[in-house]
Amino acid sequence: MLKPLGDRVIIEVVEKEEKTIGGIVLPDTAKEKPQQGKVVAVGTGRVTDEGKRIDLDVKENDLVIYSKYAGTEVKHDGKEYLIVRESDILAIVG
């Protein structure tokens, strides 16, 4: 499994099948980049200038919404993940 460092979070991207109003399924090339996913791992937190470690607000299994162009896409064990900084996460769903 991947282990993020510092204030980074690993997100498993949740992809929805997109259809037009007429019921046509859109190919991957025509889809918007997803902005929602499930947190699968969190780093140890960020360190302040004084050396104090601050825990992250998100936790494993949180469903989150993140910035559209955030992070680095990686493939691991056949699954697609996104590694983002916690500051790129906009909201926790639910």
Curated annotation (Swiss-Prot):
Does the keyword Chaperone belong to this entry?
Answer: yes
Q: Does Cell membrane appear among the keywords?
A: no
GO-annotated molecular function: ATP binding; metal ion binding; protein folding chaperone; protein-folding chaperone binding; unfolded protein binding
The positions making up the signal sequence are none
Question: What GO CC annotations are associated with the protein?
Answer: cytoplasm
Cellular localisation: Cytoplasm
Q: What is its main location?
A: cytoplasm
Under the heading Gene3D superfamilies, the entry gives: GroES chaperonin
Q: Could you tell me which InterPro entries the record lists for this protein?
A: Chaperonin_GroES, Chaperonin_GroES_sf, Chaprnonin_Cpn10_CS, GroES-like_sf
What PROSITE patterns does the record point to?
A: CHAPERONINS_CPN10 (PS00681)
Which controlled-vocabulary keywords does the entry list?
Chaperone, Cytoplasm
Cited Pfam families? Cpn10
Q: What GO terms describe the biological role, i.e. biological process, of this protein? A: chaperone cofactor-dependent protein refolding
Q: Which domain of life is it from?
A: Bacteria
Which family, according to UniProt? Answer: Belongs to the GroES chaperonin family.
Assembly description? Heptamer of 7 subunits arranged in a ring. Interacts with the chaperonin GroEL.
Q: What does this protein do?
A: Together with the chaperonin GroEL, plays an essential role in assisting protein folding. The GroEL-GroES system forms a nano-cage that allows encapsulation of the non-native substrate proteins and provides a physical environment optimized to promote and accelerate protein folding. GroES binds to the apical surface of the GroEL ring, thereby capping the opening of the GroEL channel.
Q: Which NCBIfam families match?
A: PRK00364.1-6, PRK00364.2-2, PRK00364.2-4, PRK00364.2-5
The name this protein carries in UniProt is Co-chaperonin GroES
Give the species this sequence originates from.
Exiguobacterium sp. (strain ATCC BAA-1283 / AT1b)
**Lineage, opening ranks:** Bacteria, Bacillati, Bacillota, Bacilli, Bacillales
